[in-house]
A protein has these predicted regions:
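Short, internal acidic amphipathic alpha-helical interface segments
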Residues: 61-108
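Charged, low-complexity intrinsically disordered regions
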Residues: 91-131
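Short, well-structured hydrophobic secondary-structure segments
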Residues: 43-72
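Charge-rich, low-complexity N-terminal segments
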Residues: 1-54
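Long, contiguous binding/interaction regions
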Residues: 134
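Secondary-structure transition/turn motif
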Residues: 36-41, 58-65, 113-117
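Short, highly charged C-terminal tails/helix-capping segments
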Residues: 144-161
């Protein structure tokens, strides 16, 4: 647990120990806001909101235009089933999520999870980063399953902006 260190110092140390910390961002609504890379080439945020006894792990993903086009070219039944399947699937990860949907087409999604101070350990932080990432991966895989994928991109991250 955290002995003789404040939360910011402890979380920063854990992230540095695992080579995950990429930058510290100024955020007027937070006591600290770290940008982390977990896993490689995936950016996430670790934030402690002001006056809260918890930290938030968040991962926001913008759906690439070519995938939006694939969704738009499908029928409405498929579009609605996809959004429903996405909600059911994400709910099983026990994370919070927000889907930005316009006319049954997913535009972007944000997956978040909260860890309260009394449960904050290095193990819990890393496990939560993994769970948030796996929930994001679920969204990506479900898009591929429902709408088909494009020819293999040169870089896996080309799929989502």
């Amino acid at each position: 647990m955290m002995i003789n260190m404040n939360i910011e110092e402890q979380v920063e140390k854990w992230l540095l120990d695992e080579d995950l910390l990429r930058e510290m961002k100024y955020d007027e609504n937070a006591d600290f806001h770290f940008i982390v890379e977990f896993p490689k080439e995936n950016i996430m945020d670790v934030v402690k909101p002001k006056d809260k006894d918890s930290i938030i792990i968040a991962c926001a993903t913008q759906v690439a235009p070519q995938h939006i086009n694939l969704m738009q070219s499908s029928d409405m039944k498929t579009q609605k089933e996809f959004i429903l399947d996405l909600n059911f699937g994400l709910n099983q990860f026990l994370v919070d999520f927000e889907l930005q949907v316009n006319n049954n087409i997913l535009q972007q999604f944000v997956v978040t999870e909260q860890i309260f101070e009394d449960g904050l350990t290095k193990d819990m932080l890393i496990r939560t980063l993994k769970r948030v990432f796996k929930a994001k991966l679920h969204c990506i895989w479900l898009i591929d399953k429902k709408f088909g994928s494009l020819p293999a991109p040169s870089n896996e991250n080309d799929m989502f902006i």
